[in-house]
């Protein structure tokens, strides 16, 4: 219902507004000076290893690493009114080139990261129409988009851009376009079927060549989201899956992104999606000390009825305080605390007052299917939340990528920031770099998390696919609910809390249960900011993940075993600081009891290692505290 509403609104707007604009009547400024350039341009990354070729005629691009093609010649096209394809009969002008190296603070690692890229802007003439093609190349990927003059009006009926991937690769994809919670499937690219539609963040591995690519998008503004329609044998077409015709005036298309990494270590550090997003430009984010990462207690996952019981959420205030969590999330059901919304908000005020005494902040759930669509109600809602002392909003049930909805993500985040409210999105679109533009967007779901039950096989893929988009609200650790634990071990669950990062970290297990099982000493001090991350030797997509991560002077190690068989590995502690001693708190699988685990504390140095035996779908977790 929500998606169809968006389509109707967009259709009316497009017809009403388009009457004022003509596709061909206006030419961009300086058009008379357009000078054709070469028929083909070979563009290089800053390190020279990645080459992107752009050709005119039928506008196409391709890419290669060394002598290995990673994208074969593929069309860039946009179908507008009158059946005109802007990529046909295209003539490229000489590009403007800009090399940049920008250093900025990353809020999720609290370190400086470098955005080093070369940017090319080509003027393009296509019949009587003028626009620009922007191509940006990083060492670990590239993107392209179309730019239009401010007076250009377009009624877009389809995007014809393609991504042709070599068939001798392995494809990893899922087909849940609404929520990105589908099971990740693995198949030879040459054997992919025709007409199936994949979500973005579809990834490809080049066997024997240590090359990994992923196709997605970034920086969506006034444009619907895309998916990938398989045409068979590694050929894909952009699919604007959640919209019909739509109108834009001026502006730009989203970045069409291809990440290109040459190791798993490089892959998990790839920031291309974030780099491509528009930087912060709003003064409301200056001195934003109200944006505070942290862990949150969450009663809903253990029992959905908990959120409807005011006394239970009050109890979780105390549990959050005892566990050292920064937040407590009141999920779906809080409006049942009274007969009216006004009465429910009075109860929320009681909850907030109690939480403040305990140095705990309250987050509040809100459905996108509710009245927040309407600007007056949404603004009153935000104002009320700020007045009550709410710290953040969990917006749920989105499940759409219409032009209206992708704009709603941005509008909701900005208006929330005006009231000093953080945000997470559930059942949302793919991650597209929103956190860079709107730093109060702490996380989003868009992942097959614990809600869909633990999946050891999937867990050995997602750190190398979905996590390239940034924070994911996986909601880890709920082992007391059998359907969530599924076949994985307790140590696999602990590892998920280390490997999946989220600035708003929702702990789905009851803190009292964690304490009763002796796991609070690991979970309570668990950081949500990781200053350093490494993929360790032995990791293999779809089989095993071995991570080492540092926060301050503490190191963590975590392992996912994706196999249905026991697995033994030797884990060197060489990631630790040389000449330092650490107290290691180590958690290993009980090989005969899925719900059991072994815990030891020993003193180690970087010269030491551990022999680890894991259950089928098992895992390993350890924390190293410098002494």
Regions found by a protein language model. Give the residues of each.
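Membrane-proximal basic amphipathic "stem/tether" segments
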Residues: 1-28
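N-terminal accessory beta-strand-rich subdomains and adjacent acidic, glycine-rich linkers
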Residues: 30-279
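Edge strands and adjacent loops of beta-rich recognition modules
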Residues: 108-114, 522-547
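An acidic-aromatic substrate-binding cleft motif
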Residues: 251-327
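Aromatic- and carboxylate-enriched substrate-binding clefts and catalytic-loop regions
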Residues: 332-489
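Catalytic cores of secreted or luminal carbohydrate-active enzymes
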Residues: 491, 495-534
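Carbohydrate-binding surface patches
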Residues: 540-578, 620-621
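C-terminal beta-strand-rich structural cap/linker in extracellular carbohydrate-active enzymes
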Residues: 602-627
């Amino acid at each position: 219902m929500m998606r169809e509403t968006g389509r109707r609104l967009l259709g009316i707007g497009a017809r009403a507004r388009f009457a004022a604009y003509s596709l061909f009547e206006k030419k961009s400024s300086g058009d008379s000076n357009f000078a054709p350039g070469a028929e083909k341009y070979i563009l290089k990354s800053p390190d020279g290893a990645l080459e992107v070729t752009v050709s005119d005629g039928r506008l196409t691009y391709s890419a290669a690493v060394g002598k290995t093609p990673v994208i074969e010649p593929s069309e860039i096209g946009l179908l507008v009114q009158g059946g005109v394809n802007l990529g046909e009969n295209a003539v490229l002008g000489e590009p403007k080139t800009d090399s940049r190296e920008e250093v900025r603070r990353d809020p999720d690692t609290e370190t400086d990261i470098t955005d080093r890229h070369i940017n090319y802007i080509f003027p393009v003439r296509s019949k009587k129409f003028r626009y620009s093609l922007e191509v940006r190349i990083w060492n670990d990927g590239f993107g392209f988009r179309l730019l239009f003059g401010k007076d250009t009006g377009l009624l877009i009926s389809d995007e014809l851009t393609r991504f042709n991937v070599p068939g001798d690769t392995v494809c990893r994809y899922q087909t849940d376009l609404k929520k990105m919670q589908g099971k990740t499937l693995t198949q030879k690219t040459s054997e992919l079927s025709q007409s199936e539609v994949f979500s973005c963040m579809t990834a490809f591995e080049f066997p024997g060549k240590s090359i990994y690519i992923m196709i997605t998008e970034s920086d969506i503004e006034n444009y619907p989201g895309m998916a990938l329609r398989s045409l068979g044998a590694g050929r894909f077409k952009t699919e604007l899956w959640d919209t019909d015709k739509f109108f834009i005036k001026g502006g730009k298309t989203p970045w069409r992104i291809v990440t290109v990494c040459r190791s798993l270590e490089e892959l998990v550090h790839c920031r291309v999606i974030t780099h491509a997003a528009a930087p912060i430009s709003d003064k409301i984010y200056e001195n934003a000390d109200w944006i505070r990462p942290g862990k949150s207690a969450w009663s809903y996952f253990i029992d959905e009825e908990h959120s409807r019981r005011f006394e239970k959420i009050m109890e979780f205030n105390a549990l959050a305080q005892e566990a050292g969590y920064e937040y407590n999330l009141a999920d779906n059901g809080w409006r049942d605390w009274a007969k009216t919304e006004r009465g429910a908000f009075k109860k929320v005020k009681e909850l907030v007052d109690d939480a403040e005494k305990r140095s705990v902040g309250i987050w509040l759930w809100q459905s996108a299917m509710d009245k927040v669509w309407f600007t007056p109600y949404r603004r009153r809602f935000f104002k009320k939340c700020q007045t009550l002392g709410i710290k953040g909003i969990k917006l749920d049930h989105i499940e759409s990528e219409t032009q209206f909805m992708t704009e709603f993500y941005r509008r909701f985040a900005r208006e929330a920031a005006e009231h000093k409210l953080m945000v997470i999105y559930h059942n949302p679109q793919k991650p597209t770099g929103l956190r860079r533009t709107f730093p109060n967007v702490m996380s989003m779901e868009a992942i097959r998390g614990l809600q869909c039950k633990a999946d050891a096989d999937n867990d050995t893929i997602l750190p190398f696919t979905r996590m390239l988009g940034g924070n994911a609200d996986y909601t880890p650790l709920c082992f007391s609910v059998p359907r969530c634990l599924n076949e994985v071990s307790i140590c696999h669950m602990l590892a998920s809390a280390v490997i999946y990062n989220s600035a708003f970290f929702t702990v789905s297990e009851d803190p009292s249960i964690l304490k009763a099982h002796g796991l609070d000493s690991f979970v309570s001090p668990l950081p949500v900011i990781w200053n350093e991350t490494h993929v360790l030797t032995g990791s293999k997509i779809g089989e095993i993940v071995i991570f080492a991560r540092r926060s301050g002077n503490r190191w963590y190690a975590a392992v996912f075993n994706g196999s249905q068989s026991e697995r033994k590995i030797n884990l060197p502690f060489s990631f630790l600081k040389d000449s330092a001693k650490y107290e290691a708190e180590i958690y290993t699988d009980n090989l005969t009891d899925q719900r059991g685990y072994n815990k030891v504390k020993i003193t180690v140095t970087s010269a030491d290692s551990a022999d680890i035996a894991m259950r089928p779908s098992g895992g390993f977790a350890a924390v190293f505290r410098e002494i």
